[in-house]
Amino acid sequence: MERDMMINQIKQTAVRVLPKGSTLYLYGSRARGDYHSDSDWDLLLLLDKPKLTFKDYDYGYPFSELGWESNEEINTQVYSKKEWADYHFTPFYKNVEHDKIVLI
């Protein structure tokens, strides 16, 4: 699927299913622009709460479902905004912050 069309569908899904105050980033090769046709879509979902519950990980499911329907692989990492800020020293955090595109 065309990149802009897929980003649009991800945004529409996010607006439909995510709680208020959430932030969704696209990162990795799709954000940097050095992707290939079989590259996956890496999403980082930040929820506006101090700590996640097991149920919060379910917010990633609609994006996986969108991937199945679109014949694309979508991987969603879920963190609370506080937990994400606590990872500021990690290479993963630094890579995401460098590459990210804010979707919502």
For every predicted segment, state its role.
Residues M1-Y25, R32-S37, L47-I104:
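Catalytic core of pol beta-like nucleotidyltransferases
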Residues D42-L46:
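Short beta-strand->loop micro-motif that forms the acidic, two-metal-ion catalytic signature
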